[in-house]
């Protein structure tokens, strides 16, 4: 019998109970004891195996995005973008690619409510013919900080207090008071969008700036946008309390039940592109993850549609063990020098190796559906059967060759080595424009949320003054209104 034909799978379940090694178990209810009331014997291997397995069921949860829900479906190209990219999965309208998508909250634990004010993760894994492509984004188009050096401290500030394990506003406001670049992100997070109704009724964004390369080697910067066809809907405070109090997994259940009922969620994919030769023409840096690209001057271009039409078969295998990394790209898509993207390229894969082990890409949910070949052998939990005699490259005994060369951006770099912020910070303009675009009632809700946060008794007068200064620079009336509610005087 070929042992590799019967790899562990529910498809090969026996009609009776067995141990992990396949031995039959005739009693799964009682331990092996001396008589009916005597001590349990250590030789009861089935009991020991059962308890030992149970003790190790849980794996480390994600340091961020721990709470999540996944679904499967397909991506279909609807518009020709072959002039922009040589990516095979985008080669022509009508091409379909299988996908798995994971939605998530960001800061709190695996079992936390899905009604908290928090960004939502929107990660898509494309199983293309040229390998996997992970587009790992959020439901908000910008981020808190522009340099990954700040990321660990940022997460620490947003996470619960290490002393009492309570998320506290004074810690968040203290940290970000040092970084006015966060203002634009807070204009989204403290807006109504900060609590989506569920995962179906929110947009998604690649957030970072990537690069597309066509067959001729021409490169353009690109931003990815997912637009829900269900409409964007949010929960206001009283609604969030009611929904979360009734069901702390409401968004997970909504996603599952909608797909099970045949009401398949769908998103349209759009892109924005900038020629790198024109990147200096704007009053913002196109590689700054705290900025959006104005759609009136950089219009959205339609690309395709994402449809989720199948629920996952197993939550642990296809959600907890599902792993994404922005470094996983395909020919025709490349990174940019976006500082946050550059750090995510390392950090995500490193985090997955910690959670799942060095061979996490061999797990079924993470492995490519296309043929693949390398000499990354062995290591913990490598369960792939290999019978090659040559595990080095090159070799005259192994016909494997290099793949055909594909274009990458032909950038030339020149400069001094230094740790320095970007020149075009422009931290206040877009946040102010966003606030002024809202109806008065929406502005009032935003102001109330900021007043509530700044009213935390541990927020000092100095920190309140900094935030009033920031919001005044974004919009003078906004800063004045926040100051008035706090019985303070604007300092700008």
UniProtKB/Swiss-Prot annotation:
Please give the biological process terms from Gene Ontology that the record holds: hydrogen peroxide catabolic process; response to hydrogen peroxide
What is the reaction catalyzed?
2 H2O2 = O2 + 2 H2O
Q: What residues bind heme, as annotated?
A: 348
Which ranges does the record mark as transmembrane?
A: none
Q: Which GO terms describe its cellular component?
A: cytosol; peroxisomal matrix; plasma membrane
Q: What is its EC number?
A: 1.11.1.6
InterPro entries assigned to the protein according to its UniProt record, in alphabetical order = Catalase (IPR018028), Catalase_AS (IPR024708), Catalase_clade1/3 (IPR024711), Catalase_core (IPR011614), Catalase_haem_BS (IPR002226), Catalase_immune_responsive (IPR010582), Catalase_sf (IPR020835)
What family does this chain come from, according to its entry? Belongs to the catalase family.
Q: How does it assemble?
A: Homotetramer.
State what protein this is by name: Catalase
What is the source species? Vigna radiata var. radiata (Mung bean)
């Amino acid at each position: 019998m070929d042992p590799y034909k019967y790899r562990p799978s529910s498809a090969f379940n026996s009609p009776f109970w067995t141990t992990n090694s396949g031995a039959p178990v005739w009693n799964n209810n009682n331990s092996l004891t001396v008589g009916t009331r005597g001590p349990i014997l250590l030789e009861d291997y089935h009991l020991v195996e059962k308890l030992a397995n149970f003790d190790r069921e849980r794996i480390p949860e994600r340091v961020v995005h721990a709470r999540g829900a996944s679904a499967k479906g397909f991506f279909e190209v609807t518009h020709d973008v072959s002039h922009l990219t040589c990516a095979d999965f985008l080669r022509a309208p009508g091409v379909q690619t299988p996908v798995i998508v994971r939605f998530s909250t960001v800061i709190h634990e695996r079992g936390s409510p899905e009604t908290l004010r928090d960004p939502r993760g929107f990660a898509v894994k494309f199983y293309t013919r040229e390998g996997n492509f992970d587009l790992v984004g959020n439901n908000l188009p910008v981020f808190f900080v522009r340099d990954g050096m700040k990321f660990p401290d940022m997460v620490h500030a947003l996470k619960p207090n290490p002393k009492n394990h309570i998320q506290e506003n004074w810690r968040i406001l203290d940290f970000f008071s040092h970084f006015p670049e966060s203002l634009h992100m807070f204009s989204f997070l403290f807006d109504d969008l900060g609590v989506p109704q569920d995962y179906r009724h929110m947009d998604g964004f690649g957030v970072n700036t990537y690069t597309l390369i066509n067959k001729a080697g021409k490169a353009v910067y690109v931003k990815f946008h997912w637009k829900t066809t269900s409409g964007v809907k949010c929960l206001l405070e009283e609604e969030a309390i009611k929904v979360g109090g009734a069901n702390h997994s409401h968004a997970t259940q909504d996603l599952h039940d909608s797909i099970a009922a045949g009401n398949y969620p769908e998103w349209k994919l759009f892109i924005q592109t900038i020629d790198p030769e024109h990147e200096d023409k704007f009053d913002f840096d196109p590689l700054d993850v705290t900025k959006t690209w104005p759609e009136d001057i950089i219009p959205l271009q339609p690309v395709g549609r994402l449809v989720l039409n199948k629920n996952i078969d197993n939550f642990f295998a296809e959600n907890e063990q599902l792993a994404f990394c922005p470094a996983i790209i395909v020919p025709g898509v490349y990174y940019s020098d976006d500082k946050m993207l550059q750090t995510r390229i390392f950090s995500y894969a490193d985090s997955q190796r910690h959670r799942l082990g060095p061979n996490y890409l061999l797990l079924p949910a993470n492995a490519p559906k296309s043929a693949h070949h390398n000499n990354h052998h062995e290591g913990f939990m490598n369960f792939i059967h290999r019978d090659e005699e040559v595990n080095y490259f090159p070799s005259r005994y192994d016909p494997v060759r290099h793949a055909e060369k594909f274009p990458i951006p032909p950038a030339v770099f020149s400069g001094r080595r230094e740790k320095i912020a970007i020149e075009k910070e422009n931290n206040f303009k877009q946040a102010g424009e966003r606030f002024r675009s809202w109806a008065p009632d929406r502005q009032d809700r935003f102001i109330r949320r900021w007043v509530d946060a700044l009213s935390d008794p541990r927020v000092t007068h100095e920190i309140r003054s900094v935030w009033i200064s920031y919001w005044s620079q974004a919009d003078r009336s906004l800063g004045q209104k926040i100051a008035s509610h706090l019985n303070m005087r604007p300092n700008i």
